[in-house]
């Protein structure tokens, strides 16, 4: 009888265990995130409101830029940089409706994606979607060399 009870519980435990693992995997930490909000104005997500939510809830916010596009639906791309790592779940808490991704590439790569400049300028499909005059940024754009120590680079160059 005891083994039947354990067998009955096993699928529940596995499902709960897998959900916890999935949450752990998704709840990564990062200095930089890209967010996309579809139909932002219908949901009250103006650029001003986005900035207000970021400033009010993320004390380590260093830089944010955003721009609007018209694809299959109107949407806003947002790129944020924090001074310290922020959990995915924290960003999701305040931007539930947004598609959120941990950033790949440099700060400049991500800003260029939002602006549709750099390599994105030659992509006609992206240029057609860009809505001129909607790009906004707040804070100073961090350098691409995050994590590199200039004093160590100088020392290395002196040794060579």
Show which residues each predicted segment covers:
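Short, glycine- and small/hydrophobic-rich beta-strand elements in well-ordered beta-sheets
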Residues: 58-71
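The conserved glycine-aromatic submotif of the RRM
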Residues: 71-77
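Extracellular, beta-strand-rich glycan-interacting domains
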Residues: 80
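Beta-strand-rich binding-surface signature
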Residues: 32-34, 61-63, 77
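Catalytic "initiation/cleavage/transfer" segments centered on a nucleophilic residue
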Residues: 1-58, 83-160
């Amino acid at each position: 009888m005891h083994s039947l009870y354990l067998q009955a519980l096993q699928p529940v435990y596995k499902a709960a265990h897998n959900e916890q693992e999935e949450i752990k995997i998704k709840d990564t930490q990062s200095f930089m995130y890209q967010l996309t909000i579809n139909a932002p104005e219908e949901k009250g997500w103006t650029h001003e409101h986005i900035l207000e939510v970021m400033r009010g809830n993320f004390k380590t916010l260093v830089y944010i830029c955003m721009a609007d596009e018209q694809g299959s639906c109107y949407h806003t791309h947002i790129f944020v940089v924090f001074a310290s790592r922020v959990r995915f779940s924290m960003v999701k808490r305040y931007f539930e409706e947004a598609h959120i991704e941990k950033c790949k590439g440099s700060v400049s790569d991500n800003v260029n994606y939002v602006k549709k400049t750099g390599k994105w300028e030659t992509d006609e499909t992206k240029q057609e979607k860009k809505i001129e005059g909607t790009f906004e940024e707040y804070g100073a754009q961090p350098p691409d060399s995050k994590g590199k120590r200039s004093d160590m680079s100088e020392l290395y160059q002196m040794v060579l």
